From Swiss-Prot:
EC number: 2.3.1.74
Gene Ontology MF annotations: naringenin-chalcone synthase activity
Gene3D superfamilies the UniProt entry points to: 3.40.47.10
Protein name: Chalcone synthase DIV
CDD domains hit by this protein: CHS_like
Gene transcribed to yield this protein: CHS-DIV
Family, similarity comment: Belongs to the thiolase-like superfamily. Chalcone/stilbene synthases family.
Domain of life: Eukaryota
Listed GO biological process terms: flavonoid biosynthetic process; polyketide biosynthetic process
Species: Ipomoea batatas (Sweet potato)
A Pfam family it matches: Chal_sti_synt_N
Entry annotation: catalytic residues: 164
Length: 388
């Protein structure tokens, strides 16, 4: 007769959870940030709001974004004029698009990750799907399982309405799943499209306009497993993961699903809330490792916007190159909510390899991944790079 302890030991992996592959994808429709204000005010029939357009132009100019990708084309918006008003009932039409396109975009990212992984998809044991775009039952996790042809016994977890911090959340969950289920291979997918948040401008709700200047569409997929086989190629190890609520931050970032779609509300002090709490998170994560020099680690930070990155840099005394990968993804894609940090992971390992650096983490051994969003919730993941 075996004991419970023996069963528990047999169920667990020996080594740490490891990222084994990353895939990213965007919709085909690309919008140029410099000309976006003209397009946005024209398509929303708001060209008469000249002062508001000038404000929006300044927001776009200061965003540090060069381009974004969006599923919503001019043709789709003309077919759905309610999307272009500020507060028109439109949830049904938005949902009709989101419940189809979110898993479809996620499938493309997953196929890219599975191809890099190089193993049969039948080895995938768990699926974690995350989106802030649309809600359905059965969910996008179910649709993805069907689209990819995964085994019906795959264990699924669906995360809806989490927001920008959730790229860290999915890695934290995948770490626990991989380390507590021997042989597990976890497919995590973050798929975000702005069909639920796009809306016309309002002169009384400028925080909504900030979102229109920043958000873009994209999907990222990552395969996580412990104890890699010789055929698998590790990219990063997931060493520890934590989540915390920033004190005195209630209402800093809110999202509400209504008949008009998903409305976002941002307070102006979000950059200071993040920067004032980040050092405590870093200390708690890295103190066990004896690390206190924040320039000695590689950085993957959710790029909520340029003001947040600037304040984090100033608060921690980071060298400009520390947030290179983060700023690059913000520039090339905008804020893709939960998918952003996974895009940054992909950018970092590719740039590190192309530059001939010694590790996947820009030649450094240890790194940190930060996600932050509604709550204000902060996710902190400690990463260990591998040789390139």
């Amino acid at each position: 007769m075996v004991t419970v302890e023996e069963v528990r030991k047999a169920q667990r992996a020996e080594g740490p959870a490891t990222i084994l592959a990353i895939g990213t994808v965007t919709p085909a429709n690309c919008v140029n940030q410099s000309t976006y204000p003209d397009y946005y005010f024209r398509i929303t029939n708001s060209e008469h709001k000249t002062e508001l357009k000038e404000k929006f132009q300044r927001m776009c100019d200061k965003s540090m974004i060069t381009k974004r990708y969006m599923h919503l084309t001019e043709e789709i918006l003309k077919e759905n004029p309610s999307f272009c008003e500020y507060m028109a009932p439109s949830l049904d039409a938005r949902q009709d698009i989101a419940v189809v396109e979110v898993p479809k975009l996620g499938k493309e990212a997953a196929q890219s990750a599975i191809k890099e992984w190089g193993q049969p998809k039948s080895k995938i044991t768990h699926v974690v799907f995350c989106t802030t775009s649309g809600i359905d039952m059965p969910g996008a996790d179910y649709q993805l399982t069907k689209l990819l042809g995964l085994r019906p016994s795959v264990k699924r977890l669906m995360m809806y309405q989490q927001g920008c911090f959730a790229g860290g959340t999915v890695l934290r969950l995948a770490k626990d799943l991989a380390e507590n289920n021997k042989g597990a291979r976890v497919l995590i997918v973050c798929s975000e499209i702005t069909v639920v948040t796009f809306r016309g401008p309002s002169e009384t709700h400028l925080d909504s306009l900030v979102g229109q200047a920043l958000f873009g569409d994209g999907a990222a997929a990552v395969i996580v497993g412990a104890d890699p086989t010789p055929a698998e190629k590790p990219l990063f190890q997931l060493v520890s993961a934590a989540q915390t609520l920033a004190p005195n931050s209630c209402g800093a970032i809110d999202g509400h699903l209504r008949e008009v779609g998903l409305t976002f509300h941002l307070l102006k002090d979000v950059p200071s809330v993040v920067s004032n709490n980040i050092e405590k998170c870093l200390f708690e994560a890295f103190n066990p490792l004896g690390i206190s020099d924040w320039n000695s680690v590689f950085w993957i930070a959710h790029p909520g916007g340029p003001a947040i990155l600037d304040q984090v840099e100033d608060k921690l005394g980071l060298k400009p190159e520390k947030l290179r990968a983060t700023r690059h993804v913000l520039s090339e894609y905008g804020n893709m909510s939960s998918a952003c940090v996974l895009f940054i992971l992909d950018e970092m390992r590719k740039a590190s390899s192309n530059a001939g650096l010694g590790t996947t983490g820009e030649g450094l051994e240890w790194g940190v991944l930060f996600g932050f969003g509604p709550g204000l919730t902060i996710e902190t993941v400690v990463l260990h790079s591998v040789p390139t």
